[in-house]
């Protein structure tokens, strides 16, 4: 039985976005390269580490708000560098203060510095507090479908399972768990971490993910601005392929042209 899919808008916290690519601001050579790469990506949502980014609180240093306009981009402050729930909640509150009541946040609570794997126990604790305080929580998590379900039940607006370790570029390590998460999901699912090149982004979208977030894959490319544009097209191609529906896989060949009516 064939499945006919119709596209649906990509909506986060009541706002509709045209681009399904979200990008980070770290690891670039300078702010100018950051600006050019983000422009080339076509992304509308930009994430940054609250604890590592100057939003004007440090005089005399490059200010992200002077490079990327809040009128053009939706900012997604994240809690990168936090290792427990208390620290993560405090960081989100700081982001809200620095951005004049901004409620959209990306929650990350890390387990250790070697793997940067999510500490799901602390993540669940932080998510409960943040949702109660009125934050719109997008949450970095493992590819465990049960944890993803629990985060959705808490009230997170999107789950962001890793495809591979942060900054590893390993690609989609476990597509099967992602498929289970997608089958159960009632909120947007975004691949977060592990993407290394355009084909990884396309595969993520072909699986049915709503969007992909990346930073290292662009910033660490030999030509980041060119890679940013490649990622833009990869996301679109993957989404269209998902909607179109791939052909069935077969063990043996199947001729493109029928044998009936051959010229003899």
Curated annotation (Swiss-Prot):
Gene3D superfamilies: Aldolase class I. This is Thiazole synthase. Its main location: cytoplasm. Coiled coil: none annotated. Keywords: Cytoplasm, Schiff base, Thiamine biosynthesis, Transferase. It is an enzyme of class 2 (transferase). Its EC number is 2.8.1.10. Catalyzes the rearrangement of 1-deoxy-D-xylulose 5-phosphate (DXP) to produce the thiazole phosphate moiety of thiamine. Sulfur is provided by the thiocarboxylate moiety of the carrier protein ThiS. In vitro, sulfur can be provided by H(2)S. It is found in: Cytoplasm. Pathway: Cofactor biosynthesis; thiamine diphosphate biosynthesis. The keyword Repressor does not apply. One of its GO terms (cellular component) is cytoplasm. Belongs to the ThiG family. The active site is at 106 (schiff-base intermediate with dxp). GO terms for biological process: thiamine diphosphate biosynthetic process. 1-deoxy-D-xylulose 5-phosphate binds at residues 167, 193-194, 215-216. It comes from Pseudomonas fluorescens (strain Pf0-1). Pfam families: ThiG. It catalyses: [ThiS sulfur-carrier protein]-C-terminal-Gly-aminoethanethioate + 2-iminoacetate + 1-deoxy-D-xylulose 5-phosphate = [ThiS sulfur-carrier protein]-C-terminal Gly-Gly + 2-[(2R,5Z)-2-carboxy-4-methylthiazol-5(2H)-ylidene]ethyl phosphate + 2 H2O + H(+). Homotetramer. Forms heterodimers with either ThiH or ThiS. One of its GO terms (molecular function) is thiazole synthase activity. Signal peptide: none annotated. The keyword tRNA processing does not apply.
